[in-house]
């Protein structure tokens, strides 16, 4: 490559980005764009630099230029151009997420997946965006695709379990959280979530087992201690409830402020020991 070619200048901007010299990188990529305004990689790089500078709206505009320059026909027929357009669509979606424009984000991820339908990360991000706009069935489809592409993704399985719970499909949610735990036995979030769903199903003893497993994996997991206290309260096991609650508060003193509002503790709201723990 010629030292003053637009490709060379774009590569220089990329190198400056790697060493976090974003202001210099921005000035450099602007030179490349002036030399070749229809060079999609330069616009993609500009978008990346603007993301790192915290200028999300500018980044979205830069990615839009990449998307505009590469026709859909070329994106589907020419792998190199398809990859660049896919990256621009995906990164534009991520920028929308950071701007909390989740509907726009989901739409961009959808477009990106038409170019590369086998991207685990994009299916996962699409699912998360759909959850934020309340489209649970679409989110479930996205998480299903993510777990098909990457069956050992306990993260995607956990999100899928959340959606199933919100859809009222509680037994399926428990099964899905179990799958996440089989992949990662120390995945405390899935163990805790499994316990919460089991409580909803009235399976309180099994819920206790799930919370205990989470605590064994991480004894400082305050949410599991609190949830276990709630379950012991529902079972009428006062001493176990108080012991678990004390541990939760020791780990997270902010719980004191909300104890009186938690319905599961209604039978103990006037209990002297409970009142002491809640700071009354």
What residue spans do the PLM features occupy?
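Short coil loop/turn residues that delineate tetratricopeptide repeat
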Residues: 4, 38, 72, 118, ...
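Conserved alpha-helical positions within TPR/SEL1-like repeat arrays
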Residues: 7-17, 41-52, 78, 83-98, ...
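Terminal, low-structured helical/coil segments at or just beyond the last alpha-helical repeat
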Residues: 76-83, 254-280
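TPR/TPR-like (Sel1-like) alpha-helical repeat modules
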Residues: 63-71, 233, 238-255
